[in-house]
């Protein structure tokens, strides 16, 4: 059974998608053993507790420096002994020590088709604002492994979503979540849990093997 922890900063809709997929049997051989947020007031913590999942807050505001926070975050992660760390809208840069310790065991969901509209400053609604400003006809979401760069790790899966002429950042954001993010992230967890993904020479390869 793959031990999964989910790191979140906001409402936790992607977290909920994984919870629901596990409950429905769409994600097999995986269990969410903990949820960590950097904000104690967000709904994601409530979602976790409602599902019987231990949920804690580790906020940079509670520590004297980023270095001390990074140590506290890594220590809390280790307490859950995860096999996989899922960043589901986690707006804090992951410490390099954690990236190295959990190499190819941290995945992130990003609301664009990487390499478009990604990197420093591209998160949340801002991604969709920039997509509309550029006038793209297709956007989407990407699940990728996390490395030392920002949105630069090996791509696991992508799903395209059409941009409508009357879209606002809010309507586009919602459709990307519904049509891409909420499908891609649980599927990636399932693929990893069941041995269908490996990283070869910096690229993700998909296989049909089962654990």
Label each PLM-derived region with a short phrase.
Residues 1-43:
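N-terminal Rossmann-like dinucleotide-binding module
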Residues 33, 83, 104:
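Conserved acidic residues
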Residues 41-46, 95:
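Short, glycine/polar-rich helix-capping loops at beta-to-alpha or helix-loop-helix junctions
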Residues 88-201:
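Donor/substrate-binding cores of folate-linked one-carbon enzymes
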Residues 199-211:
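A short, charged, Gly/Pro-tolerant segment at domain boundaries
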């Amino acid at each position: 059974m793959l031990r999964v922890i989910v790191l979140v900063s906001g409402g936790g809709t992607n977290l909920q998608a994984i919870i629901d997929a596990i409950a429905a049997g769409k994600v097999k051989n995986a269990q969410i053993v903990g949820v960590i947020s950097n904000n104690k007031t967000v709904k994601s913590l409530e979602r976790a507790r409602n599902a019987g999942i231990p949920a804690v807050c580790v906020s940079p505001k509670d520590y004297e420096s980023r270095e001390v926070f990074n140590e506290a975050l890594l220590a809390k992660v280790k307490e859950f002994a995860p096999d996989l760390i899922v960043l589901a809208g986690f707006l804090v840069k992951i410490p390099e020590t954690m990236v190295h310790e959990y190499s190819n065991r941290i995945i992130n969901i990003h609301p664009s088709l990487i390499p478009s509209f990604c990197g420093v400053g591209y998160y949340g609604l801002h991604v969709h604002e920039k997509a509309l400003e550029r006038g793209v006809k297709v956007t989407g979401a990407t699940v990728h492994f996390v490395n030392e760069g920002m949105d630069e790790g090996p791509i696991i899966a992508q799903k395209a979503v059409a941009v409508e002429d009357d879209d606002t950042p809010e309507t586009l954001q919602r459709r990307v979540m519904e049509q891409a993010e909420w499908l891609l992230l649980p599927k990636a967890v399932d693929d990893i849990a069941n041995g269908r993904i490996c990283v070869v020479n910096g690229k993700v390869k998909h296989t049909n093997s089962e654990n």
